[in-house]
Amino acid sequence: MARYTGPKSRIARKFGEGIFGADKVLSKKNYPPGQHGNSRKRKTSEYGIQLREKQKAKYTYGVLEKQFRNLFEKAATAKGITGEVLLQMLEGRLDNIVFRLGIAPTRAAARQLVGHKHITVDGQVVNIPSYAVKPGQLIGVRERSKSLEVIANSLAGFNHSKYAWLEWDEASKVGKLLHIPERADIPENIKEHLIVELYSK
């Protein structure tokens, strides 16, 4: 399955929440898209609920099925609660950290910046969006990329104290992953236990 590149509002309506950020369409059309979207909802099966939660997580973090499955398998063998470890791994992806630091306005934009070699880790260019950032590593903007409009606009007025597990130096345009976030600190509305139940079948 290829990464979804269609209207984000359509996906937001599918899940009934702005998984890509604030969505004005939801205030007007808070029901699923399609011909029968505004009709009475049918009861969803347990499997359907679990699958929906997995899809929500994949869309939120912009991860393909194979990548998501691989992350789950790693989380399942790691120390800790599988669902929480899975979310922590998703949060630790380079593209997500670039987004959380305010360098990019969306995760999709963050993936592009990483892929186009605008981002560095510990001073070295890294162009792999799924790169797993470790605590203590420095995430920065390549010198020649600091004047890019998308980066400047995204950083303007961004609240860098928003996430306690990240640190930002405005002068050097460098951020730092202080520690892996606890589940309670991750703001995404994802019921990870449903994903664990789905993969455990």
From Swiss-Prot:
PROSITE patterns, A to Z: RIBOSOMAL_S4, S4
Renumbered residue ranges of the record's region Disordered: 28-47
Signal peptide bounds: none
The keyword Lyase belongs to this UniProt entry's keyword annotation: no
Pfam families found in the cross-reference section: Ribosomal_S4 (PF00163), S4 (PF01479)
Subunit structure: Part of the 30S ribosomal subunit. Contacts protein S5. The interaction surface between S4 and S5 is involved in control of translational fidelity.
Keywords tagged on the record: Ribonucleoprotein, Ribosomal protein, RNA-binding, rRNA-binding
Organism: Bacteroides fragilis (strain ATCC 25285 / DSM 2151 / CCUG 4856 / JCM 11019 / LMG 10263 / NCTC 9343 / Onslow / VPI 2553 / EN-2)
GO cellular component: small ribosomal subunit
Alphabetized InterPro entries for the sequence: Ribosomal_uS4, Ribosomal_uS4_bac-type, Ribosomal_uS4_CS, Ribosomal_uS4_N, S4_RNA-bd, S4_RNA-bd_sf
GO terms for biological process, alphabetical: ribosomal small subunit biogenesis; translation
Family: Belongs to the universal ribosomal protein uS4 family.
The name this protein goes by in its record: Small ribosomal subunit protein uS4
Domain spans labelled S4 RNA-binding: 92-155
PANTHER family linked: 30S 40S RIBOSOMAL PROTEIN, SMALL RIBOSOMAL SUBUNIT PROTEIN US4M
Gene Ontology MF terms in the entry: rRNA binding; structural constituent of ribosome
Function: One of the primary rRNA binding proteins, it binds directly to 16S rRNA where it nucleates assembly of the body of the 30S subunit.
CDD domains (UniProt xref): S4 (cd00165)
